[in-house]
Amino acid sequence: MNQNIQKEYHISQDGSGDFRSLFEALSALQSSEFPEEANQAENLPAAPDFRSSGGDTEPVVLFLHAGIYRERIVILRPGITIIGDDPQTTVITGGLYARMPMEDIGKRGTFRTYSCLIAAHDITFKNVTFENSSGIGPDVGQALALYADGDRLVFENCRFLGNQDTLFTAPLPPKEIEANGFVGPGQKLPRVFGRHYYKNCYLEGDIDFIFGGATAYFENCELFSKYINRPVNSYVTAASTPQGQPYGYVMKDCRFTGNCPPHSAYLGRPWREYAKTVLLNCYIGEHICEEGWHDWNKEAAHENTLYAEYESTGPSSDMKKRPGWVKSLTPAEAAFYVKSLVLKGNDGWNPA
């Protein structure tokens, strides 16, 4: 490890810490390993892949003290833990959105709207809020609070605030459906197997506000669907699980809540036809449609997706009203979705 780099830093906007901004701290940590332009990435080059590059990987802890950090954050160095004072008072926020004009393709597009980008492995956040404040999906389009592209990522007691596409759990699918649909930092990077763990978090949005191809385990989280005055106000998840990947999204002991009228939101729909989303012991509020899940008009998804529930409770939890392609798990089948199995991969990862 570079002797000039401490193992811990404090970040405080009042100048009492080592840095005044998270951007400043990350730029200092990353400057010796990555080109300066990468610290402000719109598009990361295909090579090197920063997630697996060499350089300093000694664990570093950043204490992020209370404040509204109106910064665009890019994390490229592995082994960083960022601990906020409190998610109510420690906020990383931005306001970029997909319909913003851009010279190259005419608009910013989904994947250049992030307030925070993680393109590294072994990153942990605790007690921090990620926010995109740009507006509701029908008005501004997609707007990411967090673009999470890495393996062994942990988020504990965090909030994710936004509207359409609040949280992107990379990787991207192999191919675009629309031209220039993937323009952004991950477009040219190899698609990597990412495992994420979200514990005691609050996530909100309207359309597809948790989406992507990662294997992600959500435990004791609240998933809040926001009212946008539409017949369908919200789709909570839009997984794009790669074909052959054993796990997609697993929600355990989570609460699906919202301020939408009864039966005006869905638990999820398949961004790609091999999507996997499993609910274990979750509370399903009245705002969720009785059928629970939507097929996004993909007939092949009836055969290829996995949408499954075990011991759901709440007003919209009746499995008898779900479509035939939604599975009700037995206790033996539900045991396949314990955290230690879902996240273990080839290295036995099992975050506490």
Region spans (language model):
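Sequence-level preference for short, compositionally simple segments enriched
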Residues: 2-352
